[in-house]
Curated annotation (Swiss-Prot):
It is an enzyme of class 5 (isomerase). This is tRNA pseudouridine synthase B. GO terms for molecular function: RNA binding; tRNA pseudouridine(55) synthase activity. It comes from Marinobacter nauticus (strain ATCC 700491 / DSM 11845 / VT8). Belongs to the pseudouridine synthase TruB family. Type 1 subfamily.
Length: 307
């Protein structure tokens, strides 16, 4: 006898402006309860200290969570100079304090220039990266240091917003897997005084910005007034706007819906595409060159009554 699913079918993406002091999973569970949803997930955790853009996927949208996780991110952060902590942020114990010289903007810019573009970054011990099946932060809490190889990341933008006596405000746009705490610590090391993250706000994730984000308190207020929250959901395909649109109909569409690749003659192209039928979004497909044409391979398909 199959187990009955708890909750209702909810499909779409909700962008939350995560408040400080709570975990991403805590927010996910809270919003999932508000929707009474059977299935939901987030697309990359923010530290409890951090605020900002946290996309949540419901139902069919969870099929694209990995693609969303792989997207570029943007942040605004405050680096507190002169203090290093265990965790690289203000929640960790202080491990070193140094005097902070009076840096000019030109001096800071010269250091920031070293971190723009393709760089190698050693992840923080207080990260969720796994080692032998356990997240690194568990080892760190036990006082165990694990050797971590440097990983390539790209810093598209590293903009100095403000210089104060003991703080720097920075805007960062970067590839997935970039640790802002590690970036700030490395900048502090080159400056010679050390640094940690005292504030962090994510402004972009999976193509969504703060303009798309909702406050959980507003959702709770809507529920108390008896209003439906479903109208706040964005269609799953809005998370895939980095890929071009491609439309199919007839026999090729039927083949794709049955999970079979189709050949598109005379149209050589490659890469992922947002696939649409005659009426609606179908899913994510990958175009592979084949002779003078293209083979279109379904990768993630959504359930939909209208095609």
């Amino acid at each position: 006898m199959s187990r009955r699913r708890k909750g209702r079918d909810v499909n779409g993406i909700l962008v939350i402006d995560k408040p400080q002091g709570v975990t991403s999973n805590g927010i996910l569970q809270q919003v999932k309860r508000l929707y009474g949803a059977a299935k939901a997930g987030h697309t990359g955790a923010l530290d409890p200290l951090a605020t900002g853009v946290l996309p949540l996927c419901f139902g069919e949208a969870t099929k694209f969570s990995q693609t969303m996780l792989d997207s570029d991110k943007a942040y605004i952060t405050t680096a507190r100079l002169g203090i290093r902590t265990e965790t690289g942020d203000s929640e960790g114990a202080v491990v070193e304090e140094k005097p902070v010289p009076q840096f000019s903007e030109d001096e800071v810019e010269a250091v920031l220039a070293r971190f723009r573009g393709d760089i190698q970054q050693v992840p923080s011990m207080y990260s969720a990266l796994k080692h032998q099946g356990r997240p690194l932060y568990e080892y760190a809490r036990e006082g165990i240091e694990i050797e971590r190889p440097a990983r390539p990341v790209t810093i598209y933008e590293l903009k100095l917003l403000a210089v104060r006596e003991q703080e720097l405000d920075l805007a960062v746009t970067c590839t997935k897997g970039t640790y802002i705490r590690s970036l700030v610590e490395d900048i502090g090391e080159v400056l010679g005084c050390g640094a940690h993250v005292s504030a962090l706000r994510r402004t972009l994730a999976s193509g969504y910005t703060l303009a798309n984000a909702h406050d959980v308190k507003d959702l709770e207020a809507m529920r108390e007034r008896g209003e439906s929250l479903d109208g706040l959901l964005l269609p799953p395909e809005t998370a895939l706007t980095m890929f071009p649109e491609y439309r199919l109909s007839g026999v090729p569409l039927v083949s794709i819906l049955n999970g079979q690749p189709v050949r598109i003659p005379g149209q050589p192209f490659e890469g992922f595409v947002r696939l649409y039928g005659e009426h609606s979004f179908v899913g994510l497909a990958e175009a592979l060159p084949e002779g003078d044409g293209t083979q279109l391979v379904p990768r993630r398909l959504v359930k939909n009554s209208k095609r």
